[in-house]
Each structure stands twice: as structure tokens, then as C-alpha cells.
UniProtKB/Swiss-Prot annotation:
Optimum pH is 7.0. Keywords: Carbohydrate metabolism, Cytoplasm, Glycosyltransferase, Transferase. This is Stachyose synthase. Residues 1-11 form a propeptide.
Amino acid sequence: MAPPLNSTTSNLIKTESIFDLSERKFKVKGFPLFHDVPENVSFRSFSSICKPSESNAPPSLLQKVLAYSHKGGFFGFSHETPSDRLMNSIGSFNGKDFLSIFRFKTWWSTQWIGKSGSDLQMETQWILIEVPETKSYVVIIPIIEKCFRSALFPGFNDHVKIIAESGSTKVKESTFNSIAYVHFSENPYDLMKEAYSAIRVHLNSFRLLEEKTIPNLVDKFGWCTWDAFYLTVNPIGIFHGLDDFSKGGVEPRFVIIDDGWQSISFDGYDPNEDAKNLVLGGEQMSGRLHRFDECYKFRKYESGLLLGPNSPPYDPNNFTDLILKGIEHEKLRKKREEAISSKSSDLAEIESKIKKVVKEIDDLFGGEQFSSGEKSEMKSEYGLKAFTKDLRTKFKGLDDVYVWHALCGAWGGVRPETTHLDTKIVPCKLSPGLDGTMEDLAVVEISKASLGLVHPSQANELYDSMHSYLAESGITGVKVDVIHSLEYVCDEYGGRVDLAKVYYEGLTKSIVKNFNGNGMIASMQHCNDFFFLGTKQISMGRVGDDFWFQDPNGDPMGSFWLQGVHMIHCSYNSLWMGQMIQPDWDMFQSDHVCAKFHAGSRAICGGPIYVSDNVGSHDFDLIKKLVFPDGTIPKCIYFPLPTRDCLFKNPLFDHTTVLKIWNFNKYGGVIGAFNCQGAGWDPIMQKFRGFPECYKPIPGTVHVTEVEWDQKEETSHLGKAEEYVVYLNQAEELSLMTLKSEPIQFTIQPSTFELYSFVPVTKLCGGIKFAPIGLTNMFNSGGTVIDLEYVGNGAKIKVKGGGSFLAYSSESPKKFQLNGCEVDFEWLGDGKLCVNVPWIEEACGVSDMEIFF
């Protein structure tokens, strides 16, 4: 609990009113924001609703929230009749630019813009409105009250609707006093920080990112097995995959063993036998967990099997053949469903073809002959523990091994009567609010099969049973997926809020006990109730839908346009998710047609960088522009956000906007400009599709003032320099800029990018100007400069990495020392100062430079 309010704290609560609701108008500093506000809608100030003395927020955070509490308040509304789902307008607006985030699938959210309440999409998580009359911004965030969760929806005649739902026909309410939070600021980035800080103090059910520790893998390079193997993942493939990277000169510091390692079985089959020979995602989604340890593929692994000279080989061609057969099987399954629904006479023929393909798949698996399955009389270790121990023996730099699991165990939950837990098959019921979302295979399969739900009273045991075994087996963390399936099965369990609370509490306790309190990546979690209820301890999560290397619906251009869509998801979602979790931009494949496009964004994402390359399919030259030989990365010190001029634009299909995102390094800023045009959300078709007419070169501008220097305390001074050097990483160009300079003009080709590094110029004695840019062979050049000190008439610099170091210097140095030895350097008349830097393994790749003038 926070300390009780004293006179000092009380003085922080200002009484100035920003908002006013009267005469059916909701006003901001006297200017109407919403018109036609219904009589049953209320607005109450933050201080009249929130009880700071009951908050568990740290005193420093509490004081900050109280200092700007006058800038926020709550919408409420009342109905005469209680219900489990209540809908109400909160007023109408038109002619004002807004940015919003909406759920396009159960699990995923993305950006949307418009000018009126009717332009909103369903399941909107928040709306940020520009108020030009006051040169300010207002955000409206539907939140949680009592046992109800809320979201915004479009209404008729420019109205904004709010819907509050419990998810249970037994949990009803009629009145809400604080179902949505409203906040005002003149800075859109401050706005999001302040708003979520205020909600954190009010709800007391989650914590901000600044209050938590981030997983160790945040500044490292890793590999995820999903696109490399799908459900065929096994120890041999993982071992050879890691060995590939090692031989290529890059050491993954973490590996995520994705779906395919668990012990699942299907209803109607032997509950004690693992499902075998699964290939593609989708097949497993009706499967249920029947034991907490690894499946047969990993269970029979014998210690030392892959360490000796005669270790089993891995055949990537076999994987390719399996994928082709898996695709054939999937198409036949769809045809079978169509034949059943249409009562087609072709059904028998289709069934025959399915049997044939299944046999061919079984033959390709070949019985997984890398182990006899017979445990030797020698004292060998078997299973996951033996495997992780062998991985660490072979790959010394491997710090973390994570595994995948669904929030409810497996996609289909836990199979009743197979474990010690009280489990029940619960039919799935989707909220009406999800009707307008994109068709999703996972939703279809889970809904069809229902969910094996462990009774909420045993949620603690569910997670500890899984995680304690994993921790003992050498696993250091988990990627938890399918998080919002709980909302499908909450009717009998007190509704979506109460059920989620219990499950998230159990998950939190287990992460603390088994995985150092932070060994988790959240995924498929883009709904507001997860963030408001599930992030007390969880500090990292995905901020975009999956990396799709091609369009599953068959558009051949999807290989290109889907990548821009992914960047939009991640950039705009970070505006809100980044307040509570470290944004994770997901994996990509280094040999993909748009791999370089992805790599440019990952270079400045401020989080871990990981790929899902197939074994033997890598672009090591590209990877080495992102990753040091020791598997660490030159990480930005914040997470990237869209520049102000992109906030109310559509960088996907407006023909004119290049996505620009800004971030910080220790001694400078960076802006990435990405041409994502060519695709986007189609509200009529209710899916993402290509807009080929937009896939073209786009012009734009960039300026140093677009870096929001004041958003991090340690970088605020960098925004006050008289002059900056600007380095274009792709064009390899260098120029100077002041705060009053004209912006740099550019034209970005489709699915390409440019990275602009901005470094303050320092004047040394005699008027010499100097600024270190970093290693230009790395995409995030500025991230390679880890220490900088100006001493007398010179500079001392620590640089991590090997390659070509570049600085701006208005005059040629008299001497350049590298690691204590004088070295040759190149100085050009345009100010480019270059020197070659070796990677020194003994110094962890860090070199000391001294430059004398």
C-alpha cells in the first residue's frame, strides 16, 4: 500500500478543470469535443473516483500521477435494467483527426485512423483525438470496472459507442462510474504515458514497464523454431539449426522451442498416447495436453546422442517434403469439410486421398529413428533435461532456452481425466463484439473442439505443474500464446474479468517461482483486459501479429505487403503496450524476399532480435549487420514510436505517407523511414488485403526535431545541441543539420527503408567539431558507441563490434589510438573520419579509442 496522503501529497492534486460535461456537450478547455452526449452519461474527475491512499504504486509514480490528475477523469453511464452486456453512446464528433487501435482478431490489434465516431472499427481499445483549437490531444481508454471490461465501437451519425460486458449471463450491472478513462495533454507521447500511469494507480491490477525487470534476452540474438520446423520440431533439427548459426559466425544467445514439443492427444484417441506426425499449424488446435512433460520426440532423447562423432544427421529436404505433404493434407481436409456440408458424392474419394497422404507423411517421418526408445542399462539421462544440457555443452553462449505453451495448456486446453487437475470440456462462446473481426483458423478450430478448462481454483497448480518441471529440465522461460481463449469460456466462472484474474494470478506466481520473475514472452494477447489484469509481473510481449512470409489467402504479392503491415502493427501498438511491457517485434527469416526490410526495423526496435530460419537457409551477411559475433546486439535504449506527422496518417494505403519511427541510442537518436504502402485493413471484407495501386515509391522528409528527445530523461539533453551530424545508413551519406535547418528530402522505394542517425556535434578547443557515428557496417550504427568522453582537445570512445568506424570531424586528427596503439586512419574533406576496428574476443568485442587534435 502507498503511504496515506499527507499535506505535501495533497498539495499535488490540482483543482483546475480541463474537461466539462454540460448541456449534452463534452468540452476540452471550453471547446466541444463530443456533441449529443446522452443524459445518462456522466463524467467525474480523477480525484473524485481514484483513492490514492489505496494504491500499491511506488511513491514516486503516485506523486507524478497526482500532479497531473486534473488532466484526467472518467466516463460512466447508467441503464434502468441490469445486463451482462450494455451499450451506450458517449457522444458524437466529426471533423477531428483520430488515431485508434482496434482488435482485428481475438488475439491481435492494429492501427486505424478517421475523422468521426462512425469511422471507428469494432473492438477499439483506445482513441486519441487531435484538438487543434487547443493545440492538444485527448485520449479515451475503455477500461475495467467491477466485473466488466469495455471497448469502443462505431455508432450511427458520428456517435462513439462504448460496450461494457461481463462475459457471463449471471453477472449483470446497470451503472458504471468509471468505465472509460479520459486524459488531456499537449504532447501525444506524454499523453499515453500519463494516461496509463493514471489507470495503473486507479486499477491497482497491473504495473508499468518502469516498475518491472525485463528478461535477459532483451539485448540478444536468438532463434525460434516455428517457421523452421512447424510441428515437426525435434532435438536433431534444433541441434543442427544452432550448429548452423555457430558455423556461420553468429552465436544465438537464446532459442525458443515453439509449438510441437508438448504431449497432446485428441478426443477419441488413446488418452495416454501422444498425437504423432503432425506437420502444419492448425492440425494441433483441437489437441489437448494430457501430461506436463515433453512429447515422445523429446522424451526419448538420450544424453550425449548429438555430441559424439556419429550424431544423427538432419535432412532439410525431408522437412521440405513433409511441408508439401502437409499442405496437400490441409487442402484435402478443407475439401472434406466442404463435401460434408454440401453432401457431395466425392466424399469417399476425398477420404481415400486423405488416408494415402497420411500414410505418405508417416513414411516421411520414418519412426523418428534417432533413438530406439529403449533406455539403456547405463546411467544415461533422457528427455528434455538431457537435451538442454547437451545444447549448453555444445553451445557455450546459449543463455536461455524458452518453450511455447498456450495459456490454457495447449490450444485445446487440458484433456479431462489425464492429469491430477479438475478439467472440464467447456463449449466456446464468442462475444458479439468479435463478429466483425477477421476470419481466423485458430478461432474456428478452438470453437469447434471446445476448450479443456482447468477449474480456476487450480490455475496455480496448472502453471506450477508445467513450469516446475520445465525449470528442472533446464528451461529458463516460456512463450505463452493463445491468451484470449479464456473469454470464450467464462460464462460459468464469474465472467471474463474474474476468470482472467485467477488465471493471471496463477501464471504470475509460477513465473516468479520458476522463471526468475520475468522469464516470459506474452503472445496473442492484444486485448485490453490482458494488459489491465495480466501485467503485474509480465514485462515483455509481442506487439504485432505473426510474421507471415506469404499470404495464406494466396495473394502472390503478400510476401511483400504483409511485411509492411507487420511494421504498422508493431509501431502503433507500442504507443500503449510499451507503457506496460517491453515491445517484442517477433521473428523473421533472414533469407526472405523482404528480409532486409525486416532487418532495418529490428535494428532499431529496442528489443531482442530473433529469426526463424530453416536449417541451412540463412543470409549471414544480413544477420551480421544486426548481431555481434557473441550474439549480443547494438540495442536502442527505448522502443520505437511513430513520428508526430505519422500519428494521424495511414502509412499503408494512403499513397503519400512513409512510416517514420524514432528511437534513442546512448549518444544520439535514430529515425527509420519505411515504405509500407501497398496493403491494409478492408472494413467491408473484414481482412487485410493488398492495395497494389499504393505499392510505389513515396517521397517524404525527415528532420532532427522529429526525434522526441524528452521522452527519456537520459536523452533529453541531446535535443538541445546547436548542430547535429546526420548519417544515412543505406545511402552512406553524411551531412550537418541544426534545429532550424530545412528537412532532408527523400524518396523511399516500395518495401525498402533508410535509417537516419542524428548525433550532437561537440565543439572542441579551436572550434574543431566532432561527433561519433559508430560502426557503419551495422544497421544501428549509433548503438555500437557504448561510451563517450571529451577530454581536453580530444575524445575517448568505447565501441563494441568490428568493422568500419565512422565519425564526423571538421579537421583531421593529429593522432588516433586504438586499444593503446597508434593506427592509420582516413580523413576526408567532407568531415568523414574512418578507421578499421577488429573484433577482439578477449575484450568481448569492445575497443578503446583515443582521438587527439
